[in-house]
């Protein structure tokens, strides 16, 4: 029997496994969503009117929350390794334990979500029949499945009067996007950015624009993705259009930009699975990347740069939400607000190391770094000073959100962008 490798230290796993596995799952989910329409969306009568005006939202919130009370229990569904852990005992989650001590709410925490597609398929029958899914709180990926949950009435509208910490400490870049319907149903859990990663030693200059990925000097040295959702949205940015407000005419213009890039021989490959290693090996010099890819690679010895181009980059967000059938929604809402305390957000960020949606967690991590030693101190200092975890105000101003697509638009979108990498 071959020897098993020694497990990496907890702090190192945070730089590799969590970041890789979570984003890998998102890539798989985005691909699945782009390739096939959601079965639930074709269920006759399944869609429900979504509150749009302030009065409609207030009425929906009142209807759901009136008479609801704390019950002292909470069932929480999440992705694997996507919350803080005790460095000495990976099965323990200190912030959950502290939450129980403070509130008396006992938490049943399960890492049962593998990807958006399989999770939706697992719980959709229960939702459709009006039954509980067994969870009061869940993390949903920021992909094309999320709007479907909202349209089908599967998420509870949030009572923001009970979320004072979110109001006070939630970063402005993470609020009120059309993709999440203005936080009516969700608040961010963790986030990340999509931009350009490049090797300055290979490129020989700074990259500042999506147009730099049309530079003839980079022929055969650019990496792009076989992911219609991300590819189409960044191409919209490249042609100067905010994805959230884009039209079908804008999509055609973006697809033309991508075809120009492809036909000029600039792209070595379209892949969401190999671009990281290709960039580190020097097979490609510049690529579409997630911000965390560069943070991870540089902690491992690479000297890559990440840039949010002047035309803008994408901010993606995984979201906390409450199922409309939750048995303990007040307890879930209590935890939502608790997670937005800077000291709690800091502890979670120190483990998962994604973009933190609570900017005031940054000085907390800096203080924790001062109190730590060795590798732990080095890690926490890197986290507290990295614009890949705490984006600068200038970078935040350039971040945009994904375009929300209805069922008809999704088919039109895929018809334009999938052939770019399939042909």
Residue ranges and their predicted role:
Residues 42-49:
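Bacterial lipoprotein signal-peptidase II cleavage site
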Residues 388-423:
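Conserved C-terminal helix/tail region of periplasmic/extracytoplasmic solute-binding proteins
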């Amino acid at each position: 029997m071959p020897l098993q490798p020694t497990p990496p230290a907890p702090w190192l796993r945070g730089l590799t496994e969590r970041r890789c596995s979570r984003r890998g799952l998102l890539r798989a989910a985005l691909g699945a969503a782009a390739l096939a329409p959601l079965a639930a969306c074709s269920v006759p009568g399944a869609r429900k009117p979504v509150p749009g005006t302030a009065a409609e939202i207030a009425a929906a919130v009142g209807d759901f929350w009136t008479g609801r009370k704390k019950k002292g229990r909470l069932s929480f569904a999440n992705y694997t390794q996507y919350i803080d852990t005790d460095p000495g005992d990976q099965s323990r989650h200190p912030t959950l334990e502290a939450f129980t001590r403070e509130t008396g709410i006992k938490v049943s925490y399960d890492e049962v979500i593998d990807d958006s597609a399989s999770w939706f398929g697992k719980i959709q029958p229960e939702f459709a029949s009006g039954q509980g899914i067994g969870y009061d709180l869940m993390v949903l990926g920021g992909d094309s499945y999320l709007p479907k949950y909202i349209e089908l009435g599967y998420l509870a509208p949030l009572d923001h009067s009970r979320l004072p910490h979110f109001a006070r400490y939630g970063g402005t870049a993470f609020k009120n996007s059309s993709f999440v319907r203005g936080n009516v149903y969700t608040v961010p859990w963790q986030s990340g950015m999509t931009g350009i990663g490049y090797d300055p030693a290979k490129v020989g200059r700074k990259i500042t624009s999506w147009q730099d990925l049309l530079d003839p000097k980079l022929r055969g040295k650019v990496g792009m993705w076989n992911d219609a959702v991300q590819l189409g949205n960044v191409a919209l940015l490249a042609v100067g259009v905010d994805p959230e407000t884009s039209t079908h005419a804008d999509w055609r213009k973006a697809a033309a930009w991508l075809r120009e890039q492809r036909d000029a021989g600039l792209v070595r490959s379209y892949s969401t699975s190999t671009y990281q290693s290709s960039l580190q090996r020097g097979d490609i010099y510049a690529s579409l990347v997630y911000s965390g890819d560069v943070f991870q690679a540089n902690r491992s010895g690479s000297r890559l740069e990440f840039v949010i181009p002047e035309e803008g980059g994408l901010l993606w967000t995984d979201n906390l939400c409450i199922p409309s059938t939750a048995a303990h929604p007040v307890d879930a809402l209590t935890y939502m607000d608790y997670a937005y305390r800077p000291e709690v957000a800091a502890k979670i960020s120190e483990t998962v190391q994604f973009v933190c949606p609570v900017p005031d967690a940054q000085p907390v991590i800096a203080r924790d770094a001062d109190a730590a030693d060795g590798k732990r101190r080095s890690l926490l200092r890197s986290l507290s000073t990295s614009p890949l975890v705490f984006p600068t105000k200038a970078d935040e101003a350039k971040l945009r959100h994904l375009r929300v697509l209805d069922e008809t638009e999704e088919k039109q979108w895929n018809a334009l962008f999938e052939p770019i990498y399939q042909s």
